[in-house]
Regions:
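Acidic, glycine-rich loop-and-beta core segments that form the ion-binding/anion-interacting portion
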Residues: 252
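Conserved residues at the C-terminal ends of beta-strands
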Residues: 73, 183, 216, 359, ...
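Short loop/edge segments at beta-strand edges and connector loops
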Residues: 50-52, 95-97, 142-144, 216-217, ...
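Short, ordered loop/turn segments at secondary-structure junctions
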Residues: 32, 53, 98-99, 218, ...
């Protein structure tokens, strides 16, 4: 099958491109800018173009190698030139979920899906790490770069697909997993789900499509009660003591451990609990999830109040362990529309930190009628506004951060926008 993937270098589409390539399909693609997966795509010698997505490149590829399937992100609407060109060429068109489900069926894989508002990437990465350490034959796709493996892999003969299942745009409803892990459920993505009830209903439907379920301790456990008759093997679990920083990361680890135990049992293999614990305690982490960039300097993808709270707990633990003076946070909110929803939730989540540098919101898919909230709007609403200043990505901020590091603070960026590449360019 010949596949053309739009948005190929991002963390959503890039792993799919790598997986399909490994599975023997010819993969081409395009992207407006180079993304986090670009290096991995080049290492596999995939053919793709970076720049304006006019549709001309798609047509050129199609003329040489007839494309069977055009796959696009949510950012590519029906009016987009490349989408229009795919339509005019008579190509099959879909988002990634339909292609992934087709590949799962074609290659006879049992999907182990990780879903939830937070913790998906870390939990999936832990599953990948454990599967490699324990010699499990498992393919995978994860929405991040990994520092111990590619972001996706398929090997012929693999029995399982470890997959980070995204609820955005209801993508995960295309799947019927053998096993689903539900990390945490808290209302998000109001541009897709009009109400919290609608968001919950999507998760409930996803759970009903799963053969087996494992819930994290904070994943709205009433779902398990609702599904108990249909799924008598629903597993409710609690955290165990692990040698990993941060309660949230330890909870993610317990889910990954329980999933690996279930996989091993299904294969008739012995479950060596000590071996599993030893392996998970060696987990090296994930790109953009409390990622260490330099001594005392970290970057994290957190941009939801619950994620921020969890990441602060990790940072405070790490600062204490490494004898830092305290924690300094550089925060860039993501999407103005979401900030209107989260505004009141920020009030008390920054307790325990020493300094907070608040950046303007990274704008994406916005409602033009909504007022753009400023850093000052947020800071004035905090319980502890004295810790914060309104800042921007400039040399003044760089000087502040450099001084904080020199003064032995732990500095962490929390952002899903353009602050991460800025930080790397300045410090690395």
């Amino acid at each position: 099958m010949n596949i053309f993937i739009s948005g190929i270098s991002g963390t959503g589409m890039g792993p799919l491109a790598l997986f399909a390539h490994d599975a023997g399909h010819q993969v081409f693609g395009s992207d407006l800018h180079e993304g986090p997966i670009t290096k991995e795509l080049k290492a596999k010698n995939l053919t793709f173009a970076i720049g304006p997505q006019t549709g001309n490149y798609l047509a050129e590829i199609h003329q040489k190698t007839p494309i069977d399937w055009y796959v696009h992100t949510s950012a590519i609407t029906e009016s987009h030139p490349e989408y229009q060109r795919a339509k005019s060429l008579g190509l099959k068109i879909s988002k990634r979920d339909e292609l992934i489900e087709t590949l799962v069926e074609k290659h006879h894989l049992k999907m182990v899906a990780v879903a939830g508002t937070h913790g998906k990437t870390t939990t999936t990465s832990m599953l990948i790490w454990l599967s490699q350490k324990l010699g499990l034959k498992a393919s995978y796709m994860v929405g991040s770069t990994l520092n111990f493996a590619p972001s996706a892999k398929y090997d012929q003969g693999d029995q399982f697909l470890l997959y980070e299942a995204d609820e955005y745009d209801r993508n995960f409803l295309a799947f019927h997993p053998w096993l689903s892990l539900i990390t945490f459920v808290s209302y998000d993505h109001s541009d897709i789900f009009a109400t919290a009830a609608e968001y919950q209903e999507a998760f409930l439907k996803f759970e009903s499509q799963s053969e087996h379920l494992i819930f994290g301790p904070h994943a709205n456990l009433h779902h398990a009660e609702l599904l108990a008759d249909k799924h008598p093997d629903v597993l409710l679990m609690s955290a165990k003591e692990l040698m990993l920083p941060g309660e949230a990361r330890r909870l993610d680890a317990t889910l990954a451990i329980k999933a690996v135990q279930r996989i091993l049992e299904s294969l008739g293999r012995e479950v060596n609990h000590e071996e599993i614990i030893e392996a998970i305690n060696q987990f090296p982490g994930v790109g953009r999830r409390f990622e260490r960039l330099a001594d005392g300097l970290y970057s994290d993808y957190a941009h939801h109040p619950e994620e921020i709270r969890a990441t602060i707990n990790v940072a405070l633990e790490e600062a204490k362990r490494t004898q830092k003076k305290g924690v300094v946070i550089l925060y860039q909110p993501h999407q103005n529309i979401r900030q209107h929803e989260f505004f009141d939730e920020y009030r008390d989540i920054f307790h325990g930190i020493k300094k907070l540098y608040w950046l303007p919101t990274y704008l994406s898919r916005e409602d033009p009628k909504l007022k753009i909230l400023t850093p000052s709007d947020f800071l004035s609403s905090l319980d502890n506004p004295e810790i914060g200043t309104a800042d921007k990505l400039d040399d003044t901020l760089f000087a502040k951060l450099r001084q904080d590091l020199a003064d032995n603070y732990l500095v962490i960026l929390m952002s899903a926008g353009d602050a991460d590449p800025w930080l790397r360019q300045k410090f690395l």
